[in-house]
């Protein structure tokens, strides 16, 4: 009797899921993807909870019942929405409904042609970005002070790095951005390079002249990739350094969890109009998990909504607080919290005051 009962539950579930999927696809899409007050993954999870489906699928904690101690620690709400891919909730590898809509909303919020929800951290985003544009033997121009994910991507692809050595600030002991002249020289010396990678900003808040670098690279037929692990707020704050998408970059990896409010390990990969989004998705699917965490995805969805609606206000307050903190620290004596006074129009073209 148990197999019959299970099959009956499955039939009832998929009948309802099919109706909901059909209802979604019958909705007019114009305007929906622009409504930044929506969070489609969150909405789908709320609806899913109301369906009260008996779980015969992974994960094995069965929405918390199978692991009381973990449920007590994380909370029932968290365990209830830690679920597997299914029709009402879409599929991260090949999204067609709510995840696809969340991607469209993110792309609109960030000013990109397409956005991918990444659940392997910005490390996986950076690696997918590089894998999308270079292969074994191709050259890629990049600064020496890149993240280890970039180096690992070079190992995976077999691409050849052409390093641009950033200048150093000897007083602070930190590396700066790439000089436009040095990037231009690298492009001229390596005209067959496929791409230029830029940190926007560096870990220390230093920004190169990414607009000019984009112009130089595109004129030479090269793609521009931006590691924006620390630059989420550039897209939403006022009087911030220019974002990679606004500067015309082709791909950008954005650590939403670092300064955008989502859960640790969640990120976005942004595409400009020159990129084939489906090709990029294929590359992502080479390495990204087939068991995408809905906790991470819904955190991206909700955080994007929050920044799209309230980002200016949030980061205006952040700038005010950091400016106050910097001024107070610099009055103590023997301490120096550096700021926009480092800007020199080249290796420090702009500075992230947050």
Residue spans for each PLM region:
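Hydrophobic alpha-helical signal peptides and transmembrane signal-/tail-anchor segments
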Residues: 2-8
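Short, Lys/Arg-enriched N-terminal segments with co-localized hydrophobic residues
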Residues: 13, 19-33
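N-terminal "arm"/small-domain region of PLP-dependent enzymes with the aminotransferase-like
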Residues: 28-97
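Conserved PLP-enzyme active-site core in the AAT-like
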Residues: 41-46, 52, 70-73, 94, ...
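Conserved N-terminal alpha-helix of the aminotransferase class I/II PLP-enzyme fold
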Residues: 79-121
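Conserved PLP-binding active-site segment of the aspartate aminotransferase-like
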Residues: 352-354
């Amino acid at each position: 009797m148990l197999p019959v009962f299970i099959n009956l539950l499955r039939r009832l579930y998929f009948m309802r899921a099919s109706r909901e999927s059909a209802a979604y696809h019958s909705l007019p899409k114009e305007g929906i993807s622009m409504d930044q007050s929506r969070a489609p993954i969150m909405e789908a999870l709320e609806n899913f909870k109301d369906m009260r489906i008996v779980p015969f699928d992974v994960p094995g904690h069965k929405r918390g019942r199978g692991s009381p101690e973990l449920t007590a620690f994380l909370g029932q709400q968290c365990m209830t929405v830690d679920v597997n891919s299914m029709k009402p909730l879409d599929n991260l590898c090949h999204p067609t409904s709510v995840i696809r809509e969340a991607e469209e909303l993110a792309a609109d919020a960030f000013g990109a042609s397409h956005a991918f929800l990444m659940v392997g951290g910005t490390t996986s985003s950076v690696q997918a970005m590089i894998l999308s544009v270079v292969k074994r033997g191709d050259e890629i121009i990049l600064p020496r002070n890149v993240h280890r994910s970039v180096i690992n991507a070079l190992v995976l692809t077999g691409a050849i790095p052409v390093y641009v050595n950033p200048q150093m600030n000897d007083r602070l002991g930190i590396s700066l951005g790439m000089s436009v002249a040095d990037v231009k020289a690298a492009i001229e010396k390596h005209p067959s390079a496929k791409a230029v990678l830029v940190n926007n900003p560096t870990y220390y808040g230093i920004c190169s002249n990414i607009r000019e670098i984009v112009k130089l690279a595109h004129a030479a037929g090269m793609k521009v990739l931006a590691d924006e692990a620390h630059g989420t707020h550039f897209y939403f704050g006022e009087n911030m350094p220019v974002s990679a998408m606004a500067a015309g970059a082709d791909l950008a990896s954005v650590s939403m969890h670092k300064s955008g409010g989502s859960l640790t390990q969640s990120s976005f990969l942004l595409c400009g109009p020159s990129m084939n989004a489906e090709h990029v998705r294929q590359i992502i699917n080479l390495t990204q998990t087939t068991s995408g965490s809905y906790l991470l995805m819904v955190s991206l969805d909700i955080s994007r909504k929050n920044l799209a609606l309230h980002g200016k206000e949030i980061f205006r307050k952040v700038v005010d607080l950091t400016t106050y903190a910097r001024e107070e620290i610099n009055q103590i004596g023997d301490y120096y919290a550096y700021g926009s006074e480092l800007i020199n129009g080249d290796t420090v073209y702009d500075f992230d005051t947050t």
